[in-house]
């Protein structure tokens, strides 16, 4: 099997009431951990590359790592996606370089400017057999080079989605319903605290999601900033020398609810970073004399695999859907 687009993935997900996980990749261990979990659980998967990851690891290295994962896991569909492309030139480079899906994120621009840039990318992508994700509404938070300060985010306006999709021809739409990028998704002022002192985030705006679904029947919706920031990993990071106070994410039960609706793609990045970093910190604390990268990257890779398997089974619902 070769790399696929997300077209068939999303159709099956929409009809089946589940979502496909889109996991950000930066190196070999992350690619292996994600695809080993997806392969064993017979789940479709999207491997996505940000502008920052591309600068860090090099376009060619990342593409070849993903192609190797396809060879090693021929029984599952794998798509290679550009996350948060911010220019036509970046999207074009990825389209020309083997990606099967790209996102053009012009959500910070005016409505008309967003339409114009998205349409330009769509026309080029479709001519080359590549699908396009666009975005309406703006998420707060920090992830790679995507930075939006709290208070500057904006929910998607459902009354705009039909016109936007019709005029751009995009294949899926990322909307803003209260998710946020990074491990610090919400300020303390936005949350309450539970009995253990852990921040409890405000609920997602399912009313916005449901209105978008009503206006775009059968159309794939995407959620960005959907890491749950598992507290066991936050605790591990802090226990072994880290400092991540009040890191909090999106409750998994809310993501599971979204996946049963029209949300066909759920983006997860920070949870991978936390799983790896927590386990690497723990390893060095327990083995201060070790220096072989294979020694500490092996448990980090396993942590990624276990975390992705959990997401596939209990959040996305995509196990057995390859």
What are these regions (language model features)?
Residues 1, 18-26, 50-54, 295, ...:
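A short N-terminal beta->alpha junction/helix N-cap motif
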Residues 137, 226, 271:
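An acidic- and aromatic-residue-enriched active-site/binding cleft used to recognize and process polar
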Residues 4-12, 27-53, 60-75, 85-220, ...:
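Alpha/beta enzyme core
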Residues 1-4, 322:
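Basic/polar N-terminal segments that are highly enriched at the extreme N-terminus
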Residues 20-24, 80-81, 103, 221-223, ...:
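Short catalytic-loop micro-motif centered on adjacent basic/acidic residues
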Residues 238-239, 250-322:
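C-terminal alpha-helical cap/extension of soluble enzyme domains
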